[in-house]
Regions:
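N-terminal export and membrane-targeting signals
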Residues: 1-3
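C-terminal motif of bacterial Sec signal peptides marking the signal peptidase cleavage site
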Residues: 8-12
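N-terminal "mature-domain start" segment
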Residues: 14-91, 141, 175, 182-202
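Short Gly/Thr-rich strand-loop-strand
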Residues: 66-82, 115-158, 194-202
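Short, surface-exposed beta-strand/loop micro-motifs that present aromatic residues
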Residues: 86-94, 155-163
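A short acidic-to-branched-hydrophobic micro-motif
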Residues: 89-116
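Short, well-ordered beta-strand elements
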Residues: 103, 165-174
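A short, structured loop/turn motif at beta-sheet edges
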Residues: 108-112, 136-139, 162-164
Length: 202
């Protein structure tokens, strides 16, 4: 999954460059695939936070909950400030682990930096999903990419947007030729957007 690359980009940024966020899937949706590898984030990314990101802290209150995703959705333990970058990451999955959503939030010092981070993000997504970015009507600079993974082992739906000072990366992984339903993706993205919008302090 793309957490490692995102955080590597973040730590290489100056104050005007930003990272993004990522997610893991639901049980009630008809997506179908083996889970993504979000736990490698902190070990693979630099521990020096870029100047454009916020102070390290507990940002888990900004995440959506398993109840927001679906009835039989399980929640992995949140990873605080993965890779030494301000934010939080978590993976949701159904009980059989065939559908996952990886949710990564990266917190910046200001909304302009976060918006630029979301705008720059599509250039790095080709490593994780094969498809052309399309506009996505959530947050600022929202995009969505739907397609197979480069190795054709799973279907991937990747969503990126910013909300205020936060960049949200949501990655929905499922079985080959069984992409997450678009209405489900939109619902999860809106819930995450609302959570950030209502819980972020200025």
């Amino acid at each position: 999954m793309a957490i490692t690359a995102l955080l590597t980009v973040a730590t290489g940024c100056g104050k005007d460059e930003k990272p993004s966020s990522s997610s893991s899937s639901s049980s009630t949706s008809s997506s179908t695939s083996a889970a993504s590898s979000s736990s490698a984030a902190s070990s693979s990314a630099s521990s020096a936070a870029p100047s454009g990101t916020a102070p390290l802290a507990d940002y888990s209150n900004l995440l959506v909950t398993a109840a927001d995703i679906g009835a039989d959705t399980t929640l992995g333990p949140p990873e605080q400030n993965p890779g030494g970058v301000a934010g939080v990451a978590v993976t949701f999955s159904n009980t059989s682990k065939t559908h996952t959503i990886t949710d990564l939030l990266v917190v910046f010092t200001d909304a302009a930096s976060a918006a630029q981070g979301a705008k720059d993000r599509p250039a790095s997504l080709g490593k994780y999903v094969t498809g052309a970015p399309q506009p996505f009507a959530v947050g600022t600079n929202g995009i969505i990419v739907v397609g197979p993974s480069p190795d054709n082992t799973k279907s991937v739906t990747y969503v990126v947007f910013s909300e205020g000072k936060v960049v949200v990366d949501l990655e929905f992984d499922s079985g080959p030729n069984d992409a997450a339903p678009q209405d489900f993706v939109l619902d999860v993205a809106k819930k995450q957007d609302d959570a950030v919008k209502t819980r972020t302090t200025s």
